[in-house]
Structure formats: structure tokens, C-alpha cells
A protein has these predicted regions:
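Extended catalytic cores of very large enzyme megasubunits
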Residues: 1-223
Length: 223
């Protein structure tokens, strides 16, 4: 269903009708399982801000802001609605979809190919070790974030193009890459166990990471 508004596609190639049904399903997904929240309330708050020629990124930001504006003492779960909407937008911008993310090897390959990850990761670890590390990743842990927490990670810590604004990783890929980089020089027979345990601790937010490590340890600048 459309209301006549034309939307500029994310890839910049042409316009398409605003799909209200698709938007509703996404907001419903962001509200799923959370008490005291309403997809309709988020949509009502945001709907009057749409205009002809709006981009899909702008629509997403409007929805995120609408959900975050609803956060108060009586409705704290909107902080998770806003976080989920931000996460959906992040995944869509990086991978072109919200679910079914790439495996770790493909993700690392893409990021080393554009020189945002340190290419030495492929000399430090074998293909089999990277496949094993991939099995440690739980992308559902992205949904543990509150909106404020995820916004800080997106704005300050995820590997990105600071001039162009593109982001190249999601939180779980950030966490596993931090763990792999930190333990790369440890004995091979034990290091994957350390990687798994450290990844579990930081991805569940049980352990704080110093800013230089969180922001840069997996990149070519290595700090």
C-alpha cells in the first residue's frame, strides 16, 4: 500500500512508491515481544514527516527518532524499539538486508579488500580457525543494546568512513574481530578458546573495552 509519496532508493537509482505495508512490518518487528510499546504509536509520530523524494535512510532515521522520542519512565521499552530500528538500518546499509548476514570469512574478506581491516588477520589465522570463530558469533546479541548504547557504538566505535559516513561492520563482527586480534599471537592450541570466552564476555556487555581497542585494534592502524 502507498499514499502517493515517492521514495528515493537506498542505492540512489530512481524512485519508488512509499511502501507503507513494508514499513509497518518493520516497525512491528522492532516492537515484537516488548511490553508497553505500540508500532502504531511510532508510525503516527513519524508519518507526518514524510515528503515526496525522501530517501529510505531518512525514513529510517525518522522512525528511529519517533521511537526514541517515546521513551519515558512509563514506557522504557521504546529504547529497545529505537535500538532495533537503528540496527535494521545499519544492517540494510552494510549488507542490503536485515537478516541472514554473511559469514565471518566473507565479512573479513570484504573489509580487508577495502582496507578497513588489517589484512594480516588472514596470515595469523587459518581458514579453519576463522570458520570456527564464525560459530562463536551470536548476532541476536545485537538486540541486547539500548538505543543510547547502540547509537554510541555506531557513532564512535564501528569501523567506518568518517568522511563519507559509510559503516562497514555490525556490533557482533566488531566484537569477534577485537577478540581475534587481541589473541592472534597466543599459542594456537589455546587461542580460540580465549577468543570465544572474551567474545562472550564483551558481546554480552559483561566486560568494558578501552576506547582505543574498541575503535581501532582490528584496523590497519592497530590502535
Amino acid at each position: 500500500m502507498s499514499n502517493g509519496i515517492k521514495v528515493k532508493k537506498r542505492n540512489g537509482r530512481g524512485m519508488e512508491p512509499l511502501d507503507l505495508d513494508k514499513m509497518h512490518k518493520m516497525v512491528e518487528e522492532a516492537c515484537k515481544g516488548l511490553a508497553g510499546v505500540s508500532a502504531s504509536q511510532v508510525e503516527i509520530q513519524s508519518g507526518i514527516q514524510f515528503y515526496d523524494g525522501i530517501t529510505t535512510e531518512e525514513i529510517q532515521e525518522i522512525l528511529i527518532k519517533s521511537a526514541s522520542d517515546l521513551i519515558d519512565l512509563d514506557h522504557p521499552n521504546y529504547q529497545f524499539v529505537a535500538a532495533r530500528l537503528l540496527l535494521f538500518s545499519l544492517r540494510k546499509s552494510i549488507y542490503g538486508k536485515m537478516m541472514d548476514l554473511p559469514d565471518l570469512e566473507n565479512h573479513i574478506y570484504n573489509c580487508t579488500n577495502i582496507e578497513v581491516y588489517d589484512k594480516d588477520i588472514f596470515t595469523k589465522y587459518s581458514k579453519e580457525e576463522i570458520e570456527k570463530a564464525n560459530s562463536f558469533i551470536d548476532h541476536e546479541r545485537d538486540f541486547l543494546f539500548t538505543y543510547a548504547g547502540l547509537r554510541q557504538v555506531v557513532d564512535k566505535y564501528l569501523v567506518q568512513d568518517r568522511s563519507g559516513g559509510g559503516v562497514f561492520e555490525t556490533p557482533q563482527f566488531m566484537y569477534i574481530m577485537i577478540a581475534l586480534t587481541i589473541f592472534a599471537e597466543y599459542p594456537k592450541e589455546r587461542r580460540l578458546n580465549y577468543v570465544r570466552r572474551y567474545y562472550d564476555a564483551i558481546s554480552r556487555h559483561r566486560l568494558n573495552i578501552p576506547t582505543p581497542i574498541m575503535a581501532g585494534v582490528r584496523t590497519p592502524i592497530r590502535q
